[in-house]
């Protein structure tokens, strides 16, 4: 008789005999020991700390809120102002330095190095904009570059925290924390209205101080060592699932609160306090789950009784277990990197192989003509609002909030996979559709406040989805182990697009500024009227159509790849069940 192969996942499976003993007896479930509860709670404080860091460090999104004031103080043209926005985006080109630093220094050192760079980068700009000191344009450019680099270092610290402490749920942890980066501008706008809504230089002071303060607040969770138990039991997995659900609900509530608060100025301080409470409240989420399990035992027991008895396993963990078992039983490891001598999509790609792929360039163009245009639009919101006589703070908040919604929606392929058989690249193509619609709406009726706000919301929604979904698509198509390098190659389109699109927009802006009707403040030209950005909106709209076409081509070419990956997962799961029958 062939012996049963046992592995660490046995403890994840409920005993089927417990469902066949006749009438189920429901009883109040005992709370776990305080030491266990505290250990689990500490793990969630790490995720909450990452959320705080992300929510406070998306400082590049509020550039448009103070850019007009900075332009006036420096006495520069619109083109040179655009170069400052490019400098902030150019920091992404040096983001690899944070990975090297992690090889030599603890994570806490990397975190505070990022805080120090942001403190200096934004702090010096605040000293310049308040006329405390005077600096040449080149040094201000370097400060913008340093501030942009600090954001990359903060992001790296958050990614490492999620990967170390949530190895079985890292995709959920990463998507949740990255989403909060999208609400930074709305959060800073609310703080701006609560403190002093008449001084736009306050944004730079907040950008300098808040991430530093948050880094000190997050120090204790950052120093927490990850759990050694990489295969938690059934109760732990169910507990984690419920906590993630609560955190996602709180994320949506927080975003709605920030969005609705942007239109209210009379109770700005109360709204800001409410936002802070919503950011702190996730610390209570694990305790709510414990209370639910304790006070609603009958409901929980019935749900467990009526369930199928199967437990969802992490696919990466499943692959590792399958590999170890296969080495003992003669089963071949599935999902090999090569088929003959040809590397397929979905396998690991080197740099040379990556840039030789047509699919990569379709992906690059789709991102370049989609998400990057949305980012450049957000950088120009200050001048767009000024030229149309609108409030830039409101537009920044709308863009930030809907960018956050887009980032949350990027998880749709995982939750709706069984209902809608659409690949990630298909969702990516759909997410690009609102962008050309929004720009042509702006070209036709940008002078109307409703049209301007609607278009801004559509662009924020589209670009937010693209920013968050791109990491998963890169991993799917070009290999998960190479995603760090390959994704950094992909996002080189951001500084290129920021420079190109921003320069074109600035040139059109200055060409339509008539000295006879346009005031000149500190040698900087200010354009007023619909014509300032009309041609820019048309140009961006046409380019975004190219992005949609490119994304559709990518979707068509990658459908077989996702079908093969899905079959591999099904085969892997079936093989695992054959090796370990119940």
UniProtKB/Swiss-Prot annotation:
Keywords: Developmental protein, Glycoprotein, Karyogamy, Membrane, Transmembrane, Transmembrane helix, Transport. It is a multi-pass membrane protein. Residues 1-20 are annotated as: Disordered. CDD domains: MFS_Mch1p_like. It is found in: Membrane. It holds the Pfam family Nodulin-like. The chain crosses the membrane at residues 46-66, 100-120, 132-152, 172-192, 202-222, 243-263, 270-290, 358-378, 395-412, 425-445, 458-478, 489-509, 536-556. It comes from the Eukaryota. Required for karyogamy during female gametophyte development, when the two polar nuclei fuse to form the diploid central cell nucleus. This is Protein NUCLEAR FUSION DEFECTIVE 4.
């Amino acid at each position: 008789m062939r012996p049963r192969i046992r592995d660490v996942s046995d403890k994840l499976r409920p005993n089927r005999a417990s469902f066949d003993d006749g009438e189920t007896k429901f009883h109040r479930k005992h709370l776990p020991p305080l030491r266990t509860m505290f250990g689990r709670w500490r793990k969630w404080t790490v995720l909450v700390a990452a959320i705080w860091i992300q929510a406070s460090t998306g400082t590049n999104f509020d550039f448009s809120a103070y850019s007009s004031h900075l332009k006036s103080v420096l006495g520069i043209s619109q083109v040179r102002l655009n170069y400052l926005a490019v400098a902030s985006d150019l920091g992404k080109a040096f983001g690899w330095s944070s990975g090297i630093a992690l090889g030599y220094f603890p994570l806490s050192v990397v975190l505070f190095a990022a805080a120090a760079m942001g403190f200096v980068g934004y702090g010096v700009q605040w000293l310049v904009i308040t006329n405390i000191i005077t600096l040449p344009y080149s040094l201000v450019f370097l400060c913008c570059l340093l501030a942009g680099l600090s954001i990359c270092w903060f992001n790296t610290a958050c990614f490492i925290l999620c990967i170390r402490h949530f190895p079985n749920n890292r995709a959920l942890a990463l998507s949740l924390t990255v989403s909060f980066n999208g609400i930074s501008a709305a959060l800073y706008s609310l703080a701006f209205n609560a403190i002093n809504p008449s001084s736009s230089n306050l944004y730079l002071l907040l950008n300098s101080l808040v991430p530093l303060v948050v880094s000190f607040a997050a120090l204790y969770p950052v120093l927490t060592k990850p759990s050694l138990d990489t295969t938690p039991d059934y109760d732990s997995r169910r507990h984690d699932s419920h906590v993630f659900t609560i955190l996602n609900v709180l994320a949506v509530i927080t975003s709605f609160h920030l969005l609705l608060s942007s239109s209210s100025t009379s109770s700005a301080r109360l709204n800001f306090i409410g936002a802070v409470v919503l950011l702190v409240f996730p610390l209570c989420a694990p305790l709510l789950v414990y209370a639910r399990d304790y006070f609603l035992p009958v409901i929980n027991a019935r749900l467990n009784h009526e369930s199928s008895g199967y437990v969802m396993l992490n696919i990466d963990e499943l692959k590792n277990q399958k590999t170890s078992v296969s080495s003992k039983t003669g089963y071949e490891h599935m999902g090999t990197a090569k088929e003959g001598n040809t590397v397929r999509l979905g396998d690991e790609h080197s740099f040379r192989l990556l840039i030789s792929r047509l699919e990569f360039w379709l992906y690059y163009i789709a991102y370049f003509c989609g998400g990057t245009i949305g980012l450049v639009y957000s950088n120009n919101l200050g001048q767009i609002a000024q030229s149309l006589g609108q409030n830039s703070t409101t537009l920044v908040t709308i863009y930030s909030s809907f960018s956050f919604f887009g980032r949350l929606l990027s998880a749709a392929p995982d939750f709706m996979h069984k209902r809608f058989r659409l690949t990630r690249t298909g969702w990516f193509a759909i997410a690009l559709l609102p962008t050309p619609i929004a720009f042509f709406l702006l070209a036709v009726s940008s002078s109307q406040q409703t049209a301007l706000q609607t278009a801004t919301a559509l662009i924020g929604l589209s670009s937010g989805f693209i920013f968050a979904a791109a990491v998963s698509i890169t991993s799917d198509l070009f290999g998960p182990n190479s995603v760090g390098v390959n994704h950094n190659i992909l996002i080189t389109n951001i500084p290129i697009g920021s420079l190109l699109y921003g320069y074109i927009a600035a040139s059109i802006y200055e060409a339509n500024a008539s000295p006879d009707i346009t005031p000149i403040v500190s040698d900087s030209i200010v354009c007023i009227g619909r014509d300032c950005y009309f041609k820019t909106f048309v140009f961006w709209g046409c380019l975004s159509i190219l992005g949609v076409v490119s994304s559709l081509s990518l979707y068509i070419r990658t459908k077989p790849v996702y079908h093969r990956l899905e079959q591999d997962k099904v085969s892997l799961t079936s093989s695992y069940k054959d090796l370990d029958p119940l």
